[in-house]
Regions:
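Acyl-group handling in specialized metabolite and lipid biosynthesis
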Residues: 202-215
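An anion-binding loop in the catalytic cleft
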Residues: 213-306
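Donor/substrate-binding cores of folate-linked one-carbon enzymes
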Residues: 22, 32, 81-200
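A structural microfeature
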Residues: 28, 61, 148-149
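N-terminal glycine-/serine-/threonine-rich beta1-alpha1-beta2 phosphate-ribose binding loop
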Residues: 36-78
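A residue-level signal for conserved active-site and pocket-lining positions in enzyme catalytic cores
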Residues: 7, 29, 52, 82, ...
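N-terminal Rossmann-like dinucleotide-binding module
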Residues: 1-40
Length: 306
């Protein structure tokens, strides 16, 4: 089957590698434009572009698919199927209808749950026990197409979104490769989504990463896991200093006021409900450190307020 691949970040690059390894015919790759990266703003190619060029596949990087005759260019490439993984551009109807088998998308949630750009993170933020991957026949809506295949994935209660994303990527690449032969054979039954059960997973921001020590310990624990590695959950101390928390654990409390230091080895703080051990933190303007070192730097003792 002649495939045109569309994708941009690491998850898409891993899926593209899997397609090459499975022997699929990738006629072309579409990805986003190179972007300046880092302090020196070095122009850097998307991961997908690097993989495609390493395999000698033509790469296209249009600003949008809605103008400039890109639909005609895609038709000229004559793909039988378009595979989309985190591309970052809306596909117009003219592109959706171009291939014989249409366009499919790998979405890293169990649709219709968590439609949008950050499904893995929101599964962790909400303390879910499981998530999954879905292969969807694309339509003009946002993650609203019929589901062709899916697989559930258990979430470890201490797992960060970054750790989960690595596992989800591997499962997604495998399920994608397993689904393609069935698409070509016409043996898959597309299941319409239960749109009334849909939820969204909006993009994360640094502002929404804030939590308060008056929140419950479970909420803080999930927030820290879900915001790791980016943007990093944070709170403001009683002294007005911003502290990013990269790892914590839920601990017991005995009714102390939120923010009260219960212990310093490890640094344990009472919350609105329960308590948390702050294991790894990044104080504002400083390097990462363990919670005990942070407490020592502030000369905190049990009974103090953080």
């Amino acid at each position: 089957m002649r495939i045109l691949f569309m994708g941009t970040p690491d998850i898409a690059a891993d899926c593209l590698k899997a397609l090459y390894e499975a022997g699929h015919d990738i006629c072309a790759v579409y990805t986003r434009r190179d972007k300046p990266v880092g302090r020196k703003q070095v122009l850097t190619a998307p991961p997908v572009k690097e993989v495609a060029l390493a395999h000698g596949t033509p790469v296209f990087q249009p600003r949008t698919l809605r103008d400039g005759g890109e639909d005609e260019n895609i038709r000229a490439l004559a793909p039988e199927l378009i595979v989309v993984v985190a591309y970052g551009c809306i596909l117009p109807r003219s592109v959706l209808e171009a291939p014989k088998y249409g366009c499919i998308n790998l979405h890293v949630s169990l649709l219709p749950k968590y439609r949008g750009s950050a499904p893995v993170q929101w599964a962790v933020l909400n303390g879910d026990a499981e998530t999954g991957v879905s292969i969807m026949q694309m339509d003009e809506g946002l993650d609203t197409g019929d589901v062709l295949a899916c697989e559930k994935i258990a979430i470890d209660p201490e797992e960060t979104s970054g750790q989960l994303f690595d596992r989800v990527t591997a499962v997604g690449a495998r399920v994608l490769c397993e689904t393609l032969p069935a698409i070509a054979a016409g043996t898959l039954k597309a299941e319409p989504q239960a749109h009334e059960n849909a939820s969204t997973a909006p993009m994360l921001s640094k502002e929404m990463a804030e939590f308060k020590l008056t929140d419950s310990a479970d909420h803080i624990h999930n927030w820290v896991r879900g915001m790791n590695p980016w943007p990093g959950a944070w709170f403001v101390t009683a002294g007005g200093k911003k502290v990013k928390v990269m790892e914590c654990r839920v601990a017991e409390s005995h009714g102390e006021a939120a923010g009260t230091v219960l212990a310093t080895k490890p640094l344990t703080v009472a919350c609105g409900e329960g308590a948390v051990q702050l294991l790894h933190v990044v104080p504002e303007g400083k390097k990462p450190m363990d919670g005990t070192s942070f407490a020592a730097g502030l000369r905190l003792k049990a009974g103090n307020s953080l």
